[in-house]
From Swiss-Prot:
Residues 166-225 bind DNA. Sumoylated by PIAS1, desumoylated by SENP1. Sumoylation of Lys-9 and Lys-127 not required for interaction with H1-5, transcriptional repression, inhibition of myoblast differentiation, or binding to gene promoters. This is Homeobox protein MSX-1. Acts as a transcriptional repressor. Capable of transcription autoinactivation. Binds to the consensus sequence 5'-C/GTAAT-3' in downstream activin regulatory elements (DARE) in the gene promoter, thereby repressing the transcription of CGA/alpha-GSU and GNRHR. Represses transcription of myoblast differentiation factors. Binds to core enhancer regions in target gene promoters of myoblast differentiation factors with binding specificity facilitated by interaction with PIAS1. Belongs to the Msh homeobox family. Interacts with CREBBP/CBP, TBP and SP1; interaction with these transcription activators may inhibit autoinactivation. Interacts (via C-terminus) with PIAS1 (via N-terminus); the interaction is required for the localization of both proteins to the nuclear periphery and specific binding of MSX1 to the core enhancer region in target gene promoters. Interacts with H1-5. SUPFAM superfamilies: Homeodomain-like. GO terms for biological process: embryonic morphogenesis; inner ear development; negative regulation of gene expression; negative regulation of odontoblast differentiation; nose development; positive regulation of cell cycle; positive regulation of odontogenesis; regulation of odontogenesis. GO terms for cellular component: nuclear periphery. Residues 1-50, 64-93, 129-157 are annotated as: Disordered. It holds the Pfam family Homeodomain. It comes from Lemur catta (Ring-tailed lemur). Residues 25-38, 71-88 have a biased composition (Low complexity).
């Protein structure tokens, strides 16, 4: 129990005193024992070869010195992974994202492609070169993915006016018949039964044909007459100018306008007097009378 504190005291005293005599032998023995224990601990630790560390100075210098060293290391690591070896370089974890000098094995090209996701053959995704035989994959032929075919709407049939079944065809009049009918119409627009029968027989026409022609000709003459009357009315009607071009005067005529203008100019004799303005009588004509150059008939 007394030797441990003595040893501690001896070490404390050994640092403060020069080595010598019997007191200096105890510190030297303790130092030798500590050195031996440190050497044993270092021997117990596994020695790591510098070449195994990927980021060590020796590994970096070796990569610069030997260009083919990196390729050989990559080939060796790929061979170890292919053989199922579990040996991995230090400092690189199996699930780490940044693995130096050990790129992940390339996946097949079609792993994330449409064919890989839909589990379809690659031939079905390639467009056929010949447009004559278009090939469609099963999922495109499914009604779920492909739209329904567009319906071709037939153009609506043109509806024509239906004529009567017992309608007689239009009579083609000759030029001589038309001239004779026009001459007879100018002489007399209405024919009696006897005149119509005689005139139709002279033209080799039926009485009904002559009757219908005279009816149509009277309707045409009426339309022409109405159009002519409308033209005459438009020509005889005077063109009234708009209100902006008409001269507008108040009640009293131009003389009242001149008097009002003179009163407004010369009525203000004093500095505080306001110009006198003409005031129209209340209750009488409040609208101005417009004098126009045109006279209505």
């Amino acid at each position: 129990m007394t030797s441990l504190p003595l040893g501690v005291k001896v070490e404390d005293s050994a640092f403060g005193k020069p080595a010598g005599g019997g007191a200096g032998q105890a510190p030297s023995a303790a130092a030798a024992t500590a050195a031996t224990m440190g050497a044993d601990e270092e021997g117990a630790k596994p020695k790591v070869s510098p070449s195994l560390l990927p980021f060590s100075v020796e590994a970096l210098m070796a990569d610069h010195r030997k260009p083919g060293a990196k390729e050989s290391a990559l080939a060796a690591s790929e061979g170890a992974q292919a053989a199922g070896g579990s040996a991995q370089p230090l400092g690189v974890r199996p699930g780490s994202l940044c693995a130096p000098d050990a790129p992940s094995s390339p996946r097949p090209l079609g792993h994330f492609s449409v064919g890989g996701l839909l589990k379809l053959p690659e031939d079905g995704l390639i467009k056929a070169e010949s447009p004559e035989k278009p090939e469609r994959t099963p999922w495109m032929q499914s009604p779920r993915f492909s739209p329904p075919p567009a319906r071709r709407l037939s153009p609506p049939a043109c509806t024509l006016r239906k004529h009567k079944t017992n309608r007689k065809p239009r009579t083609p009049f000759t030029t001589a018949q038309l001239l004779a009918l026009e001459r007879k119409f100018r002489q007399k627009q209405y024919l009696s039964i006897a005149e119509r029968a005689e005139f139709s027989s002279s033209l080799s026409l039926t009485e009904t044909q002559v009757k219908i022609w005279f009816q149509n000709r009277r309707a045409k003459a009426k339309r022409l007459q109405e159009a002519e009357l409308e033209k005459l009315k438009m020509a005889a009607k005077p063109m009234l100018p708009p209100a902006a071009f008409g001269l507008s005067f108040p009640l009293g005529g131009p003389a009242a306008v001149a008097a009002a203008a003179g009163a407004s100019l010369y009525g203000a004799s004093g500095p505080f007097q306001r110009a006198a303005l003409p005031v129209a009588p209340v209750g009488l004509y409040t609208a101005h009378v417009g004098y126009s150059m045109y006279h209505l008939t």
